Structure formats: C-alpha cells, structure tokens
Amino acid sequence: LCSRLELTRKRVFLQKSPLDLSFFFKLSGRMEAEGHPALFYTPARPMLPPPDYDLAAEVQKHDVLLSYPYQSIRPFIAMLKKAAQDPDVISIKMTLYRMARESQIVQALMEAAENGKEVVALVELRARFDEQNNIDWSKQLESAGCTVIYGFEDYKVHSKLTLITRKGAEGYSYITQIGTGNYNEKTSELYTDYSFITADERIGEEASKVFRNLAVQQLTEESDKMLVAPLRFKSVLLDEMDHVIAAARMGRPASMILKNNSISDRDIILKLQEASCAGVRIDMIVRGICCVRAEVPGKTENLHIRSLVGRYLEHGRIYSFFDGTHTRIYIASGDFLTRNTECRVEVGVRVEDPVLVQKLTDILQLQLRDNVNARVMDASGNYQKVKPAEGEPLVNSQMGMYELLRNDWQRLEPWKCTTPATETEKTAAVCQEVTVEQLKQELPHVFQPAPEKAEKAAPAAQQPDHYEALEQMLNNKPRAAQPASKAPAAPRPVVKPVVTAPKKKSLLERIGSFFRR
C-alpha cells in the first residue's frame, strides 16, 4: 500500500478498531479557517438559469437535460413546488432512494399532499447507510397524507423516477423526470449526474405503468421508450450492442462509448468482447469496479477503459451507440453490475432530442480528452495516469463542463455551439436510426488514417507534500520557516465551504446499532 500510494512508513498507522473518518467533515472547516489554501479547491457554484426561467413551461417546448453539479438542482425543486400548488396537477409520484436530511424535495411532496393532491412516494428503506434517515422521512410523508410504498422484498428499487400528472382542458398531460442520481440537494453539488425531463406522452404513460406495477410489487415486462430493470434493461442494451456489431461487420466505423460506475455483468462483458473482436471501437469510462480487462490482444484489443477521479464523484450513466451513421444514446440509474441488471429496479431512457444527443456526445468526448483526472487501464489490469505530452494543453473535463454548459439555458443548437467539434464528434452525426437490413447493403470502403503518436511526455511537476502541513496544524506546531527568496503568500479570506456534508452517525455507532438489532 505504501508503494502504490508513494507513502513513507511514518504516514501509516495500525489499529485494531474500525477506522472512523467522520471527523474529516469538521476538520475541513477548521483547516480553511486557519489558512491552508493549498489544500482546498477554488469555490465553484452550480450555474443558475435566468430569473424568469420556468422549467415546467420549458419542458412543454422541448426535452431538458440538467447536468449536476455544474447546473443547479433548484429549477427542478421549483417545478415540484409549483406543481404542489397548481390546482390542475392531480398527482405527483416519485421514487426516493437517498434524501438530504433537510430535503426541500420531500417538503414539496408533503405540501402537495396537504393541498389535496395524490402523492405516491416509493421509499427504499434498504439504501445503505441511509436506512434510519429514510425511515424518518417515510413517517413524515405518511403523516402529511402521502401514500408511501416500501418497494419489493426481493428487489431493491434504485431507480430515479418522477411523474407529475396534470388534468387540463385538453385532457391529461405528463411531466416525467428520469435521472442518474438521487433526489438529494447535498449530493447534487458533489456528484456528477444527469436529469432528463420531458413532456413526452408515451414516456409519461410508461412511467405511470411503472408506478402501478411498483404499487402491487410487480416487475415491468414491457416498455418501448423506457428501460426498466430487471426485465427490460440489459436486454435492450445487448440489442443495441448487437446492432453496432452488425454495422462493424459490414465495414462501417461503428463505436460505443459507455460511461458508468462499475461493470461485472458476465453477459455484457462477453458481448463487449464480441464487439471488440468484430472491430467495434469501445471507449468505457468506469470509475469503480471493473471486471473486464482492456486491450488484451485477440479479445479486447479495441476496448479502451479509463477512470476519472477528480473534484466531483463521477456518478452519471450514459450509454452511446454509433453504427457508423447514427447515434442512439441512453441515460440510466443502473450500472453494468449484476446487482443492477438483475436484482434491482432501475430506470433508463433513450434521449432522442437532437440537441440533447449532441450535448451528451460533447460531454463524453470531453471526458475522453481529459488528461488531468484520467487513468487508463492496460492489458494487465493496472491503471496508469494520463500524462500530457509536451506542449499539449491540459484538459480537466470537470472544469471544462462549466464552459461547455455556459450557454445551455439559452438552448443553443448543436451547430451554434462555441466549442469546435473534433473529427470524432463530427462523425457521430445525429440522424434518424438505421435498421439491420439497411446495414446489410454493400458499403464503400471507409479509410481511417492511423492516429498520430503523441510526443514524449514531459516530466511531471513535483507536487507539494501537504501531509507535513496537516500534521503541524493538528499538533499545533509552528510551520517551518520559508526560504528568504520566497515571498510569503497573502492570507486567504475566510469563506464557507462550498458544501457542508450532512451529519451522519459514526462507523462505530452504526456497527453498535447493527449488533443491538
């Protein structure tokens, strides 16, 4: 461990009891107050829409995709609060997995119930480490008049689904939200996630069907627009992979970009291997568990895997399939873990709006260019940090998202974006879908020049060791004198942290409560 993390022996401590790191939440505020700017990120706030922005009205014009934490969750909360007071809204239904301890989202649901609307909340009590918090919220929801469902006995409900039903002069209409992350105001400022909001009638009807099935503990077997695990999630994605494989075998420059947290599902791994052998270029962005090896000759030589670990926790799931002519892209709450594909109720959706397809494609391409937070897997399963070549500009995909989404509230068309598209992005055109029969037509040979070799990487700059400063502060030791040649740094003004982590029980308290049960 010392070797892999490049630590000296004096940085390692041995103890028999479980390690409780909850003190770090308090430590961060103390360290900032005492002046240690080098240990902190520059404050960054989620971008807000114009003051007159109305998400519910915007969704009636076109689909909307919010990207957290770069864009604020406040427009979604405002839409819920408005629905709670709208006399034409007859019901609000939502799946709740992890909620903030002071949740405006749950407050909006309770307000809607108090206003006489039908409110259905599916609360998953088995959300790890949030069991007590979810129990407390479920009691308050019931007291406010909400119908609370506690999910399945054999399947954990991990989906992020909201359905607002409105009855107007022209009949019923829906606003459906499908996300990759929780309805949690705190984590929406720490995790990267995507929230798709639409007024599509067919998606609304399918979402209504999902809630009806959840109410009677039945799984959703049929859906057209939505992916619903465990019966209609993996099968749809495998079909998409088969479609791309067929395109590659006919000579098209087919490719896939798959972004999620983890992968362990055997069926998907075997299909990825088949796609690689068929000539499909596969780029995977996998932050956590990865049970497939990249670039193994004869098996996964066309499969490239990278992990992004930076300021924010990469939590979004995007699945993009390019058959050489057209792009089909999905977002979902589920990863490629067997527990997600077979043992949980997950929800995903195909994004069809051309502007949003291009937006998601730009996000994926930006992350594939990252040379600051990225580590790539080699054939042995080891990860190597990406080192920029000499003269190559640094690309931090997380910070680049602020620029990418700078004009997003104005909804610029893809061809009006300020960021120029790369050759790869130009190839991934957004067009109507193509059938397998069309793929079987004779195709012209597609010439693709070999990629240029990067120049020799420049030696990495030596990073300052902040451990010494941390130890000195904790032990109230004076800091070592700086060399005379260096001017002392100006004191940093005291500012509050960007996000304050919610108070949780310590690990020892959780273990003790477990044994008391």
Model-derived segments and spans:
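Hydrophobic alpha/beta core scaffold segments
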Residues: R281-I285
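Active-site glycine- and acidic-residue-rich loops that bind
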Residues: R266
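N-terminal localization/anchoring segments of enzymes in phospholipid and broader phosphate metabolism
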Residues: L1-M256, E274, A278, C290-Y312, ...
